[in-house]
Amino acid sequence: MKRRTLDILFSIGGLGLAGLLVVVGMVFTSNANFANDYVKTQLSQQNITFKPLNTLTAEEKAKPGLVKYAGQKLTTGKQAEVYANEFIGLHLESTAGGKTYAELGTVQTDLRTQLAEAQKAGAANVADLQKQLADVTAQRETVFKGETLRGLLLTSYGFSEMGAKAAQAATVAYSAAALLLLLSLAGLIHAYRTPKTVAFAAPEIERKVPALV
């Protein structure tokens, strides 16, 4: 095979791959834009704003994310992660001794059992048990709302991270396409400069030296 023909074939193949990588990059870019726009739209509709810096408590000021985004409206996945973990998470820890919704359910069930037994026995601590049950019920409702919102915000953060990964993949695809384009153009230039008669890896013909008599 002629060297020029081989260069042209490889160059055309490289251009084809470069075009394919551009298409792949466009798909990744489209997915990244969709994820970012979707997250921004959904979070903006919630109308959540970080507390201003001068209203943060000492515990809240110890959270770098709350200080960084103080007073800002929540519109990005990263902000959603900070609000979920550093703000809601902090307040959930201080509610009901850090117990979860499921753990408070166990406490609530136990108190109901104790209250029923106390009422049957006519015990003197019925009012106290009723107050404890009311407090735990209120705490459990608060924790449920907090955990639900926290879960939704973390889901938005995860979706935004998928968009970020897609954007990174698009950058890699575009970079690889650019590299292949340059190599293909270099191959075409080399093919243009190579004479048509030059063969690729042509075998050397052994010279026969006449024997001396």
Spell out what each predicted region is.
Residues 1-38, 175, 192:
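Hydrophobic secretory-pathway targeting helix
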Residues 1-18, 141, 145-152, 156-161, ...:
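N-terminal pre-first-transmembrane soluble regions of secretory-pathway and organelle membrane proteins
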Residues 22, 26, 137, 141, ...:
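Polytopic transmembrane helical bundles with strong interfacial aromatic enrichment
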Residues 38-45, 200-206:
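Juxtamembrane extracytosolic/periplasmic "stalk" immediately C-terminal to the first targeting helix
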Residues 48-147:
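Long, solvent-exposed extracytoplasmic domains/loops
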Residues 2-12, 162-213:
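Juxtamembrane interface at the cytosolic side of transmembrane helices
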Residues 127-178:
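Short, aromatic-rich amphipathic segments at membrane interfaces
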